[in-house]
Amino acid sequence: LNSITRLHRFSALVRSHIRDPRRLDAVTEIVGLDLFCPNDLYFFKPPGTGRPIAWHQDSWYFRNIYVSSVGDAIDQSTIGTWLALDDADEANGCLWVIPGSHRLGVIDHSQVESDDYLLQKRVTVSDEMEERAMPVEVPKGALVFFNNALLHRSTPNRSDRFRRAYIVHYMKATIQHTGNRPRFPEGTEHWGTPEMYICGQQLPGCVQTTLEKDSMDWDRALERTLTEDDIRISEP
């Protein structure tokens, strides 16, 4: 088991963590006062295993699903947070980044020609960029903030320790759905990814985080919106 996505849909504890004022103090300063959460993700990466993740940008994935209603680039409308649940270092497969790569904007991704990687899309980087890459070694409890256009990856866990992490993405409320990749059955009101309201305004014509009401009621949420793609479990 490598990861579980969208825990916020079914856990009040997770939702309270995502809305923790200590997080939002920083996020609202960087992104803005009106926010929703498009996705959260829990990585296990157990000792001696855990598939690597190739160089990629989260904004590339978001660009296929969302568009700004006010003309902002998608990489200027989102931010990622990465919470270390264990000490993270090179040995147990910490996060790697290429400093300054977010200034390149969103780069096209290509298919990974290997089943060894957790994600099947990647950015091919130059030797010069590879040389600038640096590990993000942080202690348990550290919270890393990064632009969603920042090129990042992680390596396998070659240690005898876990390297667990919890990732939350925040997005401006000025975002609209592109109409791509519907994730809910026909006949329901919910399209796009299962977003969560965070703070501020919900703007007309933009993403409306109606799932907040459903997610408080486990049975209703399961009956109306749960599909196999909602909680995706990746086998090692």
Model-derived regions: residue spans:
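Generic beta-strand structural signal
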Residues: 33-35, 39-40, 51-53, 77-83, ...
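Short edge-strand/loop segments of extracellular domains
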Residues: 45, 98-105, 163, 169-175
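Secondary-structure boundary elements
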Residues: 24, 28-36, 73-75, 85-91
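Short, surface-exposed loop/helix-turn segments at secondary-structure junctions
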Residues: 57-59, 64-67, 114-132, 162, ...
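Non-heme Fe(II)/2-oxoglutarate
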Residues: 143-145, 149-236
